[in-house]
Amino acid sequence: MTTTIIWTIAILTVLGAVLAVVLYIVAEKFKVEEDPRIDEVEKVLPGANCGGCGQAGCRAFAQFCVESSPNLDKCFCPVGGNEGMQKVAAVLGVEVAAKEPQVAVVRCNGTCENRPRTNEYGGYQSCRVKAALYSGDTGCSFGCLGCGDGVAACQFGAISMDPVTGLPVVDEEKCTACGACVKACPKAIIELRNKGRRNMRVFVSCVNKDKGAVARKACKAACIGCGKCAKVCPFEAITVENNLAYIDFTKCKLCKKCVAECPTGAIHAVNFPVIKPKPEAAPAAPAAPAAQPVKKEE
């Protein structure tokens, strides 16, 4: 009995040692050499693994940066921003051009007041599920479905649902422009746009492509595709296609002429300073009557 146990232990020990040697030889022969700079780049990244860079995660993005070096034009981490990319460039010993910061914008103004409900949805609270089942619980089949898929997708707590309007609201201070909410929205009402000068932006807060009368019936704030905004824009920043106006933020100079011209209020201007009306000048005091000459007594 004792001899059997000893032989069993010896055989297993030898077998384990042989297999370990074989595994070591195979690992050394087929190992893939990895650039040590990948680890260095990964250390300076935020570590959010949000996928906003277009890669699977921060590790994959670090590898992509190393492989793309010295040209980092296609590499950008929205969470780290320009400051983070400067750190990446410093590790790789290259230069990188600064990019315009962006923010998520909700292009729908179909509030509970503007877009009345025509039916009530009682299924699973998910925008994707709701969109797959039917066109929504209002007359507009293009607008926000209100289930908060974008809120759930945001890792930074930058989006919340407004209980009064029923629409998502973006916190610009927290938004990193990772694009997770854009991918999560089945109606494509969320868009990444340049923050603009002093965070001021002008955009069409509507995605309805129905004809004007149909769109207006479904929502009081819908774009009706009249084209008035495009006609008054001096910079050719506005186009109208499929009954819907769109403002190219790379051409827009923030003159706001389109905002004043829009008959439905579908164009929004945000973060502009409030211009206080000039106080009216006080009416001038009436002129004093001219003095009468004094007659001398004779």
Task: Please provide the spans of the model-predicted regions.
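Ferredoxin-type iron-sulfur electron-transfer modules and their immediate structural context
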Residues: 2-226, 231-232, 261, 265-268, ...
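Strongly charged, low-complexity linkers/loops
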Residues: 228, 238-240, 244-246
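Beta-strand-connecting loop/turn residues
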Residues: 164-166, 236, 243
